[in-house]
């Protein structure tokens, strides 16, 4: 199990990313616009750097919904490999069965 503080930190990062999504997109559009003046582009870079670091979506880490485990995360299920295996063995995931050949 991950620490509760780590789970809370991830929730905070998701909230910040949602809050600043439009602002970040607007600034990135200005930065990538070749027709904008150099001064405007540079000011946009400075404003983007002044935003909270955790508002960047790349700072988020996929975590297991049940345990908070950050490694071996399966996006399809939103769980770690360990919890997917346990759920599959109990028959809780429809259509998923253990491989046998």
From Swiss-Prot:
GO molecular function: rRNA binding; structural constituent of ribosome
Keyword Hydrolase included in the entry's annotation: no
Keywords tagged on the record: Ribonucleoprotein, Ribosomal protein, RNA-binding, rRNA-binding
GO BP terms: translation
Single GO cellular component term: cytoplasm
Domain of life: Bacteria
Keyword rRNA-binding appears in the UniProt entry: yes
InterPro entries reported in the protein's UniProt record: Ribosomal_uS14 (IPR001209), Ribosomal_uS14_bac/plastid (IPR023036), Ribosomal_uS14_CS (IPR018271)
Subunit record text: Part of the 30S ribosomal subunit. Contacts proteins S3 and S10.
Family in the record: Belongs to the universal ribosomal protein uS14 family.
Function as written in the Swiss-Prot or TrEMBL entry: Binds 16S rRNA, required for the assembly of 30S particles and may also be responsible for determining the conformation of the 16S rRNA at the A site.
The protein, known as: Small ribosomal subunit protein uS14
């Amino acid at each position: 199990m991950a620490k509760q503080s780590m789970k809370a930190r991830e929730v905070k990062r998701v909230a910040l990313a949602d809050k600043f999504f439009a602002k970040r997109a607007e600034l990135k559009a200005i930065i990538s616009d070749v027709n904008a003046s150099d001064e405007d582009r540079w000011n946009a870079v400075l404003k983007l750097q002044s935003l909270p670091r955790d508002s960047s979506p790349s700072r988020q880490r996929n975590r297991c919904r049940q345990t908070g485990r950050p490694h071996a995360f399966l996006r399809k299920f939103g769980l770690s490999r360990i919890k997917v295996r346990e759920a599959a063995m109990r028959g809780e995931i429809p259509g998923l069965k253990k491989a046998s050949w």
